[in-house]
Design a protein with these regions (language model features):
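Expand to "…catalyze enediolate/carbanion chemistry for C-C bond making/breaking, isomerization
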Residues: 1-225
């Protein structure tokens, strides 16, 4: 993906033309920052279509990653996710978002001082995640700027992974291994999932009694499992 300037600048259309004209055949997505509404996604979609046609590329081959970085973008995130089939990913941009809502923290991604009743980012992350899941998009958490604080990166990455996010940005090579480990299935989870599938297949078969639900140890399993 290539990040272009947002639509509030005078450079966006030139960025898109230059990037797609120069590297369109090897380009997967354009990342659009500071998205505030579906009209900005549709505008990028139309521009991409024109440049793809001009360059002889298959129309629609280049996706869009929409970054949510302010309050307006969050309130419109459902419409943004649904704005175009090109949209593949919804990304949280914590630094600009914190500034846009006047959050009292100077460390991006960390809890604001004085707020000790929960996670100040929980609503934001869940709002983005629900829109992404409702419209079958990826949900990606944004960067952690304290690149030397690997424990801090791990802590906030585990938070978004626990909610169901598909990944988190890395800004430094030291963060890569942590991101891969956190957002990859654990072997224990994989093995347990295999047991559930095997047990469900057996118990729903004629030989296993053709049951709709069964027990796997102390756990009830059914189609939803």
């Amino acid at each position: 993906s290539v990040r272009v300037n947002d639509w509030t600048t005078e450079w966006t259309y030139l960025d898109v033309i230059e990037v797609v004209s120069g590297a369109g055949a090897n380009l997967d997505c354009i990342m659009l920052p500071k998205v505030q509404g579906p009209e900005q996604i549709r505008a990028l979609d139309m521009l991409l279509t024109q440049v793809e046609k001009a360059e002889g590329l298959d129309v629609g081959r280049i996706g869009i990653e929409a970054q949510i970085e302010n309050a307006m973008g969050l309130t419109m995130v459902d419409e943004i996710a649904a704005a175009s089939p090109r949209v593949e990913t919804i990304i949280f941009g914590p630094a600009d978002f914190m500034a846009s809502i006047n959050m009292k923290s100077l460390v991006v991604g960390e809890q604001p001082p004085g707020y000790d009743v929960g996670d100040a980012y929980h609503y934001i992350l869940m709002r983005i995640l629900m829109a992404a899941r409702a419209y079958d998009k990826q949900a990606i958490d944004g960067p952690y700027l304290q690149i030397k604080d690997l424990d801090g990166y791990t802590r906030v990455a585990e938070r978004s992974a626990a909610l169901g996010f598909d990944g988190k940005w890395v800004l430094h090579p030291d963060q890569i291994a942590a991101a891969n480990e956190i957002f990859s299935p654990r072997q224990d989870d994989y093995d347990h999932a295999e047991l559930i599938l095997d047990a469900y297949e057996w118990y729903t078969s004629a030989a296993g009694g053709a049951r709709g639900a069964a027990m796997l140890g102390d756990e009830m399993i059914d189609e939803a499992s």
